From Swiss-Prot:
Motif Nuclear localization signal in this chain: 370-380
Polar residues bias spans: 220-232, 272-288, 321-342, 417-428, 542-551
Protein name: Selenocysteine insertion sequence-binding protein 2
Biased composition (Basic and acidic residues): 151-165, 206-215, 527-536
Native organism taxonomy: Eukaryota, Metazoa, Chordata, Craniata, Vertebrata
InterPro entries named among the record's database cross-references: Ribosomal_eL30-like_sf (IPR029064), Ribosomal_eL8/eL30/eS12/Gad45 (IPR004038), SECISBP2 (IPR040051)
Domain of life: Eukaryota
Region (RNA-binding): 666-687
Taxonomic source organism: Rattus norvegicus
């Protein structure tokens, strides 16, 4: 019979036999039973031999397989059920020499009903056909007849053999009737592997089990006539065999003799199961699906062979184990090994029709103990998972419904456990890790959200108030880290001009949401008080006598008419102020002739004292604190000078704001000018001539006189030019300005010197006008009064026309004519004197 032989172990030749090894001598060596081949055997393909070492192309008809003959960790049922396990765990099983069926191995110290048996390597000899023709049910009584004395004798014999040999390897040779002993090194590698696996296998959990009720055919009387046999293990450690012996023997199954731990395969006349393949008929097939950790063994056999059905169904739901035992544990008794759960999972026992008769009660008792142990233990796989080629899948679920249901139930029960274990391991590995999602920051969205929060009309106030920039400088956040940097950057930024009221304010420290009301100064209080008093006086006068008010208004009109011709009689320097259309010029013109009127009014007031009573030089637009005549040239020069200084100051603020504060060009306001004037820091003062009149002590007039006196003491030029609004516009201010102080006129020296020259000339003219007015008041003759220029004639004619039209007395006309003549003569004399003086100056310059 041709068969595929697996590779021999590597260390077979190098290992020597031990001196203590006792050779096995079969008791019944004279009887040799030839292996008969079945004509109906189903031959497996040659490729199946690689994954199923027990499969033979032409298997023998009758075989006995002993689980003790295999390495510890190998399954105890036929190879078609455990071939995948052998492929997965090559080091847990010995190499088998699958030889012809004619090989015979005599078995020593064994009790058989027949004289001698033939065995394949790893199998026991099988009985002749005629001995196995009895139905399997007949083995029932045989199992029950086994006594405890025989069990003890067998255990003593087995323990003595273990002490002497440890593990007794044996290998059958092709020669018929000869027995060959193998060295201890033959099983060295499987034993070494079993030592490693025993540690982790003790705590493993049984994967599946079966009960006697699942296989009713085994209870038939066919198996009742099977004699009990005892066998000393031929090769491999004895621990798993003894474990399975006690485990299944207590359950009371008439499947196999578990005391000896052997597996019997029989062949009947109608067809039998060989040790490697289904041999009953071509339709007898098996489907195997084997995985390391408790996956299901599926088998379907046709109904043609009843004996094969009984044999196969008896081993389907046996437990699968994942560990092996150490060779040093051979001295352990069967009771101790039966209590170890790892051994109960190590072997699969494939019973045959020849079963042992004393293990029925033990199997029944051990079945309940296995259920209790199943709940407490968990299976731990120590084998590495390798890809396994699946055997041919041939199913016949109709013949074995219980098998398919039990397999599916076990598969459903085990798959969640494996998944939960894998999930637990993955969770343990990745439990401490953080999320691997990349963090993304959208700066644009953040800025948009901040702007939206700031500009929201009804936004809730946040814990940190939002700071808005008051001036041109952006205000940074007040964080501890950026506090100093914010201060430095705010200093570097160019602020606005603080002298420019139209510019936005700079934030200086803390600011109130509602600014605190300014407390008016004492000067402002006095000014406001006088304004209120004047308003009340006007209201009282208008309410007391409206008729008197009308008469007074007529008198005022007459007084105004008297003052109108007076500007027609100014002197030469006064004529320069006439063409000016601004109100200060008109005031100057009216003030100059007012002085002349003051000289001649006493004469004119004699006939009509009411109309010419004490005319004044100064008015509301030309206040009495002014000491110079107003002129257009002076105003233009002052405007150009101030604009130039303002431009210099703003340019300095743009370059260096800190330096611009120390080197200011201008200062505004009465208080500031007076303060810096007392500090002797000012070089020039420009005063508006139309300041408000306040005669109270400490009022505006007193302050102006104080400023003028200080300037005269320090010999600082002061100029009266422009009005308050014009002075503010020249400084780029929208508010009226009363007084301006100049710290430095560098860069505008020409304009400054020109302004000073014009101011000196206007002041000299003012002095001459005052002298003439004093002379007229002293009673000088009319011709000595300043004559009126000829250009004033059209104004006189208009005045005369108005007087004639109003129907006034011609006496005024005569008086005005006399005055005009006197003014004309005086004007001619002044012209002559001026010409003489100018000629003298020209001569001196030459």
């Amino acid at each position: 019979m041709a068969s595929e032989r697996p590779r021999e172990p590597e260390g077979e030749d190098s290992i020597k036999l031990s001196a203590d090894v006792k050779p096995f001598v079969p008791k019944f060596a004279g009887l040799n039973v030839a292996w008969s081949e079945s004509s109906e055997a189903c031959v497996f393909p040659g490729c199946a031999a690689t994954y199923y070492p027990f499969v033979q192309e032409s298997p023998a008809a009758e075989q006995k397989m002993y689980p003790e003959d295999m390495a510890f960790g190998a399954p105890a049922f036929p190879a078609q059920y455990v071939s995948s396990e052998i492929a997965l765990h090559p080091f847990a099983y010995p190499t088998y020499a699958l030889e012809s069926t004619q090989s015979v191995c005599s078995v020593p110290t064994l009790q058989y009903d027949y004289s001698q048996a033939q065995c394949h390597p790893g199998f026991r000899p099988a009985k002749p056909r005629n001995e196995h023709a009895c139905p399997p049910q007949e083995a029932k009584c045989v199992f029950k007849k086994k006594s405890s004395d025989e069990r003890r004798a067998w255990e003593e014999q087995k323990s003595s053999n273990r002490r002497a040999d440890g593990a007794v390897p044996c290998e059958a040779r092709p020669a018929r009737g000869s027995c060959h002993l193998k060295s201890d090194g033959y099983h060295k590698r499987p034993d070494r592997k079993s030592r490693i696996l025993t540690k982790s296998a003790s705590t493993s959990k049984p994967e599946f089990e079966f009960s006697r009720l699942d296989f009713p055919e085994l209870q038939s009387p066919k198996n009742s006539n099977l004699p009990e046999t005892q066998k000393q293990p031929r090769w491999g450690p004895l621990g798993p065999a003894a474990s399975n012996m006690s485990l299944l023997g207590e359950a009371g199954k008439p499947v196999a003799d578990m005391v000896e731990g052997k597996m019997v395969k029989t062949d009947h006349t109608d067809g039998a199961v060989t040790n490697n393949a289904a041999t009953s008929s071509p339709s007898c097939t098996r489907e195997l699906s084997w995985t390391p950790m408790g996956y299901i063994v599926r088998q379907t056999v046709s109904s043609d062979s009843a004996a094969a059905t009984e044999t196969v169904n008896s081993i389907i739901n046996l437990k699968k184990t994942t560990s092996s035992a150490d060779a040093k544990n051979v001295s352990v008794t069967s009771e101790a090994l039966s209590s170890d759960p790892s051994f109960s999972r190590e072997k699969r026992v494939h019973p045959g029709p020849k079963a042992k008769a004393s293990q029925g009660s033990e199997l029944e008792q051990n079945e309940s103990s296995k259920k209790n142990k199943k709940k407490k233990e968990k299976s731990k796989s120590s084998y590495e998972v390798l890809p396994v080629q699946e055997p041919p899948r041939i199913e016949d679920a109709e013949e074995f419904p219980n098998l398919s249901v039990a397999s599916e139930r076990r598969h459903r029960g085990e798959s969640p456990k494996l998944q939960s274990k894998q999930q637990a391991q993955n969770d343990f590995k990745t439990g401490g890790k953080k999320s691997q999602v990349p963090v993304q920051l959208d700066l644009g969205g953040m800025l948009a959200a901040l702007e939206k929060q700031q500009h929201a009309p009804h936004a809730k106030p946040s814990s940190r108030p939002v700071v808005f920039s008051v001036g041109a400088v952006p205000v940074l956040s007040k964080d501890a880290s950026s506090g100093e940097r914010g201060r430095r950057s705010s200093q570097v930024k160019t602020p606005h001009n603080p002298l420019d009221s139209s510019a936005p304010l700079m934030k200086k420290g803390k600011q109130r949401e509602i600014p605190k009301a300014k407390k008016p100064t004492s000067l402002k209080k006095i000014i406001l008080k006088e304004r209120q008093e004047r308003m009340q006086q006007r209201l009282q006068e208008s309410a007391v006598s409206p008729t008197v008010a009308s008469d007074d208004s007529q008198d005022v009109e007459s007084g105004v008419t008297n003052q109108i011709p007076s500007p027609d009689n100014p002197t030469g320097p006064e004529k320069t102020e006439e063409p000016m259309s601004s109100t200060p010029v008109v005031e100057g013109e009216s003030e100059e002739p007012a002085g002349t009127e003051f000289q001649r009014d006493p004469e004119a007031c004699q006939p009509a004292p009411d109309s010419a009573t004490f005319p004044k030089i100064h008015s509301r637009r030309f206040r009495d604190y002014c000491s110079q005549m107003l002129s257009k040239e002076v105003d233009a020069c002052v405007t150009g000078l101030l604009k130039e200084l303002v431009r210099f100051q703003d340019r300095m603020y743009q370059k260096d704001p800190v330096k611009a504060k120390t080197k200011r060009r201008l200062v505004l306001g009465l208080r500031e000018v007076l303060k810096h004037l007392k500090l002797r820091k000012l070089k020039c003062i420009i005063i508006s001539p139309n300041c408000e009149k306040t005669q109270s002590k400490g009022g505006l007039d007193d302050t102006l006189h104080t400023i003028i006196d200080c300037a005269c003491e320090q010999n600082i030029p002061f100029v009266f030019a422009l009005n308050r609004k014009a002075l503010g516009r020249s400084l780029n201010k929208a508010v009226p300005v009363s007084i301006v102080g100049i710290f430095s006129y560098d860069g505008a020296q020409d304009q400054f010197h020109k302004m000073v020259e014009l101011t000196m000339a206007a002041r000299q003219a003012y002095k001459t006008m005052l002298e003439t007015m004093r002379q007229e008041q002293a009673g000088e003759p009319g011709p000595q009064t300043p004559p009126s220029p000829p250009m004033q004639d059209p104004i006189q004619s208009t005045d005369e026309g108005t007087l004639a039209s109003t129907g006034e007395e011609p006496h005024y006309i005569e008086i005005w004519r006399k005055h005009l003549e006197a003014y004309s003569q005086h004007a001619l004399e002044l012209e002559d004197s001026l010409e003489a003086s100018t000629s003298q100056m020209m001569n001196l310059n030459l």
